[in-house]
C-alpha cells in the first residue's frame, strides 16, 4: 500500500512558518503583504496563488494544523477536531446542519 503524500509535513520541512497553539506563541506584530482569514476552499487556493506570485502571505485559522498522520479514518475522532461545534452547528430553525471546518 502506498503512503499518501503529506503536503503540510513537506511544507514545514521546506521552511513554512507556523505560529500559535502548541507550536509556540504568536508575535505581537507580523508583517506581510496579504492576510487570508480561513484556509477553506477559497482561502487555501488564494494563499497558494498569492504566495506563488511572490506575495508574503499569512493564513489565519481557528483550529489546529493537521497532517495526514493525524487521521485514522474514525469519524468520532475527526469531527470534534475538524468541524465547528463537532458538526452540531445548525441553522436557526435547526432544519439544516452546517459543516463548517476549523483546521488547516
Regions found by a protein language model. Name each.
Residues 3-104:
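N-terminal glycine-rich phosphate/pyrophosphate-binding loop and immediately adjacent elements
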Amino acid at each position: 500500500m502506498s503512503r499518501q503524500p503529506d503536503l503540510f509535513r513537506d511544507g514545514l520541512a521546506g521552511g513554512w512558518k507556523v505560529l500559535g497553539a502548541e507550536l509556540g506563541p504568536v508575535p505581537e506584530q507580523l508583517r506581510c503583504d496579504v492576510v487570508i482569514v480561513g484556509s477553506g476552499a477559497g482561502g487555501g487556493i488564494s494563499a497558494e496563488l498569492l504566495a506563488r506570485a511572490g506575495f508574503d502571505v499569512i493564513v489565519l485559522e481557528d483550529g489546529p494544523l493537521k497532517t495526514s498522520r493525524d487521521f485514522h479514518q474514525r469519524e468520532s475522532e475527526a469531527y470534534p477536531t475538524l468541524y465547528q461545534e463537532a458538526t452540531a452547528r445548525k441553522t436557526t430553525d435547526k432544519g439544516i446542519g452546517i459543516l463548517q471546518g476549523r483546521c488547516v
